[in-house]
């Protein structure tokens, strides 16, 4: 059985690098999208187990990517974690309304994030 496949979507290179390192170290397959447009293409081509998604990106924002993903019945199994500096209650609510499974405000604990990813994955993963 293949390891879980994680898509990391963020326009901040340092966050992408550290998350990619942690996810690969944990044994996950990792794909990267550096903006919302790349994320839309990626979710159209591949069913990911977990999508870690920034909200504020220059082209297509994370809310739009999440809504797009949720409109695809063949991607119903994909779990979405918003990782964002937008931490007001209204922003968090908007994230859940867009279809997020989890909303993690930046700055975040990488250890906690890894635990949360593990909890969102099916037990066999």
Tell me what each language-model feature is.
Residues 27-34, 42:
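Short hydrophobic/Thr-rich beta-strand motif most characteristic of the beta2 strand and flanking loop
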Residues 54, 84:
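Active-site residues of response regulator receiver
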Residues 57:
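Receiver (REC) domain active-site loop signature in two-component systems and cognate sites
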Residues 47-52:
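Active-site beta3 strand of CheY-like receiver
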Residues 17-25:
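Charged docking surfaces used in two-component/phosphorelay signaling
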Residues 108-117:
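C-terminal output helix
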């Amino acid at each position: 059985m293949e390891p879980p496949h994680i898509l990391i979507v963020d326009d901040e290179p340092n966050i992408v690098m550290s998350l990619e390192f942690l996810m690969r170290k944990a044994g996950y397959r990792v794909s990267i999208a550096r903006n919302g447009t790349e994320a839309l293409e990626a979710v159209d081509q591949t069913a990911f187990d977990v999508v870690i998604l920034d909200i504020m990106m220059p082209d297509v924002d994370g809310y739009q990517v999440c809504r797009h993903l949720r409109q695809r019945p063949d991607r119903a199994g994909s779990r979405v974690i918003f990782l964002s500096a937008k931490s007001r209650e209204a922003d968090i609510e908007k994230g859940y309304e867009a279809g997020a499974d989890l909303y993690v405000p930046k700055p975040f604990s990488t250890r906690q994030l890894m635990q949360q990813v593990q909890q969102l994955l099916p037990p066999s993963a």
